[in-house]
């Protein structure tokens, strides 16, 4: 079993990090002395083993980088003439199958697939739609759009338009376009004050809410800029931005704005909160738990773990250990990367 290296480093500014580059804050590092053919052969043997050798499959796929997993899938197809996803579907089941199938997709493919599933059939899974659209960078959103087009032969924006309505639709479409300013190094205090004042005047100060103004500011300004805007906002409004959102809008739009503000202020804490919510009380919201563990493992899992421990007193590793079991638990703990 390859060792999982814990490499702490400075969090890169969003937009400057290539989607193909391993983040220093990810919990899963590329395996050294990697041999795709050897891994593919081991997975083939594990699948053919009577009862299936899940442990071997888990140990390989949770301890390789995304690029290495793509190489393994290619090598597997070359040697068996079968697609790795199809082979895993036939060999695994339940939550473990969901995790393993998620791991062998590229990040854009995974997000695109989750978004498609959230809008498939009757009704919309707004929770998934909001989480992904609110938390991804411009580059990630562009990559998701391309993957969505390639996988489903339609446009992401078109599906969002047909599956949502009203101001919630406007917010989701504006975010999905990925047009946020990401040059957060320059501080424009005049613009910060102007945006804070306009947010106040478009909401709490008036009767009714100018949602379009809120959408424009919150989907186009950089995260560092908006963090300062939200601070400045308190000098105009008797309520902070989150309290103002709760007073001004309701339903999916309220939920979306609140998720967006959390992502802007502290994205790792946002995901830590989501993970906690997925495991607190009786039962587990496996869909949320799996999606975050799979999608953040190479990006900021170490930072998420840090925020989780700081806020909830016990480690993410501990919570997963208490809330899951068996091979599914083992896979998630490997993605978590260690205890704190």
Curated annotation (Swiss-Prot):
Annexin repeat placement: 34-105, 106-177, 190-262, 266-337
Entries under Gene3D superfamilies matching the protein: Annexin
The keyword Calcium is assigned to this record: yes
Keyword Ubl conjugation: no
SMART domains per the UniProt record, alphabetical: ANX (SM00335)
Residues bearing the modification Phosphoserine: 27
Note from the entry: It may cross-link plasma membrane phospholipids with actin and the cytoskeleton and be involved with exocytosis.
Functional note: Calcium-regulated membrane-binding protein whose affinity for calcium is greatly enhanced by anionic phospholipids. It binds two calcium ions with high affinity.
Protein name listed in UniProt: Annexin A2-B
Native organism taxonomy: Eukaryota, Metazoa, Chordata, Craniata, Vertebrata
Name of the coding gene: anxa2-b
């Amino acid at each position: 079993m390859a060792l999982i290296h814990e490499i702490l480093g400075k969090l890169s500014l969003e937009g400057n990090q290539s989607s193909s580059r391993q983040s220093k804050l990810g919990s899963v590092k590329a395996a050294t002395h990697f041999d795709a053919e050897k891994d593919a052969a081991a997975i083939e043997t594990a699948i053919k083993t009577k009862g299936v050798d899940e442990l071997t499959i888990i140990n390989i796929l949770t301890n390789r980088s995304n690029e290495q997993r793509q190489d393994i899938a290619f090598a597997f197809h070359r040697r068996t003439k079968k697609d790795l996803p199809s082979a895993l579907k036939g060999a695994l089941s339940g939550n473990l199958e969901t995790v393993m199938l998620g791991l062998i997709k590229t990040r854009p493919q995974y997000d695109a697939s989750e978004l498609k599933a959230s809008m498939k059939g009757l009704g919309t899974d707004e929770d998934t739609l909001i989480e992904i659209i609110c938390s991804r960078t411009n580059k990630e959103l562009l990559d998701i759009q391309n993957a969505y087009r390639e996988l489903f032969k339609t446009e992401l924006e078109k599906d969002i338009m047909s599956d949502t309505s009203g101001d919630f639709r406007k917010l989701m479409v504006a975010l999905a376009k990925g047009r946020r300013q990401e040059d957060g190094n320059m501080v424009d205090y005049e613009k910060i004050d102007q945006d804070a004042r306009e947010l106040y005047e478009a909401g709490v100060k008036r009767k009714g809410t100018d949602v379009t103004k809120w959408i424009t500011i919150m989907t186009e300004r950089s995260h560092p800029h908006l963090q300062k805007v939200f601070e400045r906002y308190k000098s105009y409004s008797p309520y902070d931005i989150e309290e103002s959102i709760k007073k001004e809008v309701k339903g999916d739009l309220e939920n979306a704005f609140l998720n967006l503000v959390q992502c802007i202020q502290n994205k790792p804490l946002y995901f830590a909160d989501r993970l906690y919510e997925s495991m607190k009380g009786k039962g587990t919201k496996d869909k949320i738990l799996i999606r975050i563990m799979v999608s953040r493992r190479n990006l900021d899992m170490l930072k998420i773990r840090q925020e989780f421990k700081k806020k909830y007193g016990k480690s993410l590793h501990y919570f997963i250990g208490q809330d899951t079991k068996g091979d599914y638990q083992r896979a998630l703990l490997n993605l978590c990367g260690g205890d704190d």
